[in-house]
């Protein structure tokens, strides 16, 4: 992101409004740098932000074009960790095999398949289902940067762990990863409904 001059063209180009500037209150150094806010929608990898970038800070390429981060389950916010029945993140995930359920019907994210599109975070109902508990602000599943410590944790993390280990998932289209654009790591291309 060193090439980013914070011109805002990627923000204007995003048809879903998920590319937003890092707020000053969140990070003084990264202030104004493009980041992803999945409360507005999810990314379908249309690459309009990449096309609009005049500096090449966002670029096609790399072994995995579709990689915005990785989803992490927040166990004290995820409804499935307290009650059975919520499978919204798994049901809505457009990448086959990225989210499965464990023996207790709780979501498990498989980082090797997850592309960080944010659909799971967008549709997660935990904040509204837990409105009675003011201590729960987080979604039950959130997208973090692959380089963050939270992404390196195995299984689910707590809200405290997430807050201390979360790194802003800055819009980045050229991160290294084991598989390529729209192709499931096992070889078949059943990963997306749109934009292959």
Give the residues covered by each predicted segment.
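Mature N-terminal segment immediately following signal peptide/propeptide cleavage
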Residues: 1-12
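Membrane-embedded segments
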Residues: 15, 19, 24, 32, ...
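Flanking helices and flexible, charged tails adjoining ferredoxin-like Fe-S electron-transfer domains
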Residues: 1-3, 23, 30-42, 51-196
């Amino acid at each position: 992101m060193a090439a980013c001059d914070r011109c805002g063209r990627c923000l204007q180009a995003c048809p879903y409004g998920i590319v937003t500037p890092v707020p000053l209150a969140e990070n003084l150094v990264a202030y104004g740098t493009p980041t992803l806010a999945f409360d507005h929608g999810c990314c379908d990898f249309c690459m309009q932000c990449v096309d609009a970038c005049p500096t090449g800070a966002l670029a096609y390429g790399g072994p995995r074009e579709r990689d915005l981060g990785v989803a992490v389950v927040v166990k004290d916010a995820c409804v499935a960790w307290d009650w059975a029945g919520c499978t919204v993140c798994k049901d809505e995930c457009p990448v086959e095999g990225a989210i499965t359920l464990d023996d207790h019907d709780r979501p498990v994210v498989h980082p090797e398949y997850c592309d960080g599109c944010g659909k799971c975070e967008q549709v997660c109902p935990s904040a509204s289902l837990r409105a009675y508990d003011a201590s729960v602000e987080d979604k039950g599943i959130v997208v973090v940067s692959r380089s963050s410590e939270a992404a390196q944790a195995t299984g689910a993390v707590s809200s405290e762990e997430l807050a201390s280990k979360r790194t802003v998932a800055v819009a980045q289209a050229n991160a290294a990863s084991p598989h390529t654009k729209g192709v499931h790591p096992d070889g078949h291309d059943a990963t997306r409904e749109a934009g292959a």
